[in-house]
């Protein structure tokens, strides 16, 4: 038995867009307490004592006068004398704060913090006072700040994700007084998944060093061969805008750290399974290995915040201080001799205990957690949805759900009601026979096959119920490559017959009020378009477009348009004719009403 009452009903009600009074549609959580990373409302913070003489993945920097070292440890920032001792915590609390960098005058420290809700670049005084946010990214990740020699600018990495959740970086320049920043080193494409980061100013301020994954192609792969060149150090010239290769070769080169006198470059190279500290003479191109005992860098894996932690030169360009083996190690670059800078941190960390639900391993009945494709019947009395690979119908007023079919041999998905509420179109799937588009009565019984042996999605009835339109996709990745010829949007009589292709390179077919025009979605992950065509794929019109919009839903009367942007559902009037409108949840040419509270999936009109 499958208990589904609460989850399915809530999902259908939350995602059904009924008539349009703003108060009924938009239930924003305006009265909820504002979220504060440093003091989250409604949670209990427990202090855990800390007494350590070493740390993991510690970023560090040395003050311009050479007297003070700053470092991060478990998300807090400390300063202490360069000789070692008891550190002073200058950045603390629940926000995770890392990568401290002294300003050229030594009075301020730039750092990375999620204090504002996401990783951004912040600036504080040397003693930790007057923290202020420099960058204001709400979607991208910012990290790895570095000051210009005149103290007027900060260069940092901005991280971009892709459809795979992996991504790459760009190098951006920010004035310390604020602003949106200036792009210096652009990613090769929006689909690029190879890392770029670790920016740092040259001592003369004329160029910026950074690291780039130089392996062929745009797609990231795990377990790359670090014996060859995975990463290389490059230089961006501010005057010309040109980029040139600086250091690479076998074992790669990461974490570029130029000496204050501009004559040398400290960097990390891999030798077999061991990361080593090297020094490059920038005049002659000669490399010397000066320290063997680094921890493993992250060349083969993912390095959003850097391939190795920040290290720093002493002001006389004679020594490099680098984290390794849990310690802060001072390495004399002339002799290769190293010594540990001792420290002991005795304080605490605030932690919030996670929820600990009790989960029965194998109950006789259970509540499904992921009902999908919930669609309310035209009369508003029932909802059909898919869970555990089967289609179910449930009264909107509550009560038990029932199976729509008695088919135990196949998976079922993408249910859609006819306008009269008497039939449901859906997709049936088996690995052996592939997919079929079918129509069945809302009370169950025998189904009619409309399309066979293919990869199908989202069948939808025309308003008069005479036509079903659907997507035909291509397999070959996780599914069989069979049945993949001529993908596109098709139409077929709802009683059966020959399928006719309407268009290609489109998805999510649907109707508005008319039987002779089909709406589809075109575009890519960044920007999509709502387009309509006649049943022969002609008389094309663009109605709307929007960045990061991944779903459009035209109301049955053709008067309104629901769209999904940034995981939320919004509603706007649908302009008649071929008036192209730019959509944004922030508003614009048309009034926008938010229709969801805490996210929206499978939006549809009742």
Roles of regions detected by a PLM:
Residues 2-12:
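Bacterial N-terminal signal peptides that target proteins for export
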Residues 10-20:
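Bacterial N-terminal signal peptides
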Residues 22-26:
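Sec/Tat signal peptide C-region and signal peptidase I cleavage site
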Residues 27-28, 53-54, 72-78, 91-97, ...:
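A flexible loop/linker signature enriched in serine peptidases of the S9 family
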Residues 34-57, 352-371, 587-592:
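A short helix->beta-strand "capping" segment at the edge of beta-propeller domains
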Residues 59, 63, 87:
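Glycine/alanine-rich phosphate-binding loops at beta-alpha junctions
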Residues 61, 101, 146, 200, ...:
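Conserved beta-strand position repeated across blades of beta-propeller domains
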Residues 64-65, 104-105, 149-150, 203-204, ...:
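Residue-level detector of Asp-centered blade-edge/turn motifs that repeat once per structural unit
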């Amino acid at each position: 038995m499958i208990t589904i009452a609460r989850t399915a009903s809530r999902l259908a009600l939350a995602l059904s867009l009924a008539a349009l009074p703003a108060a009924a549609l938009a239930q924003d959580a305006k009265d909820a307490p504002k979220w504060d990373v440093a003091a989250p409302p409604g949670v209990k913070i427990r202090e855990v004592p800390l007494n350590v003489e070493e740390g993991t993945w510690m970023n560090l920097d040395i003050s311009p006068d050479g007297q003070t070292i700053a470092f991060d440890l478990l998300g807090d920032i400390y300063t202490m004398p360069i000789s070692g001792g008891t550190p002073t915590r200058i950045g603390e609390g629940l926000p995770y704060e890392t990568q401290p960098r002294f300003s050229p005058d030594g009075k301020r420290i730039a750092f990375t913090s999620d204090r504002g809700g996401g990783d951004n670049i912040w600036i504080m005084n040397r003693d930790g006072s007057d923290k202020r946010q420099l960058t204001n990214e709400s979607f991208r990740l910012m990290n790895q700040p570095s000051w210009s020699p005149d103290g007027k600018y900060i260069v940092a990495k901005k991280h971009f994700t892709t459809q795979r959740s992996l991504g790459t970086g760009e190098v951006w320049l920010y004035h310390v007084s604020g602003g949106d920043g200036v792009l210096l080193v652009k990613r090769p494409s929006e689909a690029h998944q190879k890392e770029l980061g670790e920016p740092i100013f040259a001592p003369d301020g004329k160029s910026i060093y950074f690291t780039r994954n130089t392996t062929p192609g745009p797609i990231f792969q795990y377990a790359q061969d670090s014996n060859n060149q995975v990463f290389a150090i490059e230089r961006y010239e501010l005057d010309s805008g040109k980029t040139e290769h600086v250091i690479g070769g076998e074992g790669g080169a990461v974490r570029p750290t130029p000496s204050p006198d501009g004559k040398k470059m400290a960097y990390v190279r891999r030798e077999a399974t061991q990361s080593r500290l090297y020094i490059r003479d920038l005049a002659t191109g000669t490399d010397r290995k000066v320290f063997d005992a680094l921890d493993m860098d992250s060349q083969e894996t993912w390095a959003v915040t850097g391939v190795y932690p920040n290290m720093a030169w002493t002001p006389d360009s004679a020594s490099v201080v680098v984290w390794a083996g849990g310690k802060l190690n001072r390495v004399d670059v002339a002799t290769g001799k190293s010594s540990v800078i001792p420290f002991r941190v005795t304080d605490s960390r605030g932690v919030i205990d996670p929820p600990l639900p009790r989960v029965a391993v194998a109950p006789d009945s259970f509540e499904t957690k992921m009902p999908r494709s919930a669609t309310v019947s035209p009369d508003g009395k029932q909802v059909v949805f898919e869970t555990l690979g089967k289609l179910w119908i449930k009264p909107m007023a509550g009560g038990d759900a029932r199976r729509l079919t008695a088919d135990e041999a196949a998976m079922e998905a993408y249910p859609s009601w006819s306008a009269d509420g008497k039939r449901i179109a859906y997709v049936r799937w088996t690995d052996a026979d592939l997919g079929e588009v079918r129509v069945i009565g809302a009370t169950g019984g025998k189904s009619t096959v409309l399309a066979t042996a293919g990869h199908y999605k989202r069948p939808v009835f025309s308003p008069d119920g005479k036509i079903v339109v659907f997507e035909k996709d291509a397999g070959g990745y996780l599914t069989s490559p069979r049945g993949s010829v001529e993908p596109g949007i098709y139409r077929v009589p709802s009683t059966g017959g020959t399928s006719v292709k309407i268009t290609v390179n489109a998805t999510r077919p649907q109707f508005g009020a008319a039987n002779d025009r089909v709406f589809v979605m075109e575009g890519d992950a960044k920007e999509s378009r709502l387009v309509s065509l006649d049943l022969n794929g002609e008389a094309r019109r663009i109605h709307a477009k929007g960045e990061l919009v991944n779903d459009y839903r035209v109301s049955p009367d053709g008067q309104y348009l629901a769209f999904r942007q940034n995981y939320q559902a919004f509603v706007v009037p649908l302009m008649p004719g071929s008036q192209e409108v730019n959509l944004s949840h922030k508003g614009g040419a048309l009034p926008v009403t938010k229709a969801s509270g805490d996210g929206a999936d499978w939006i549809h009109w009742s």
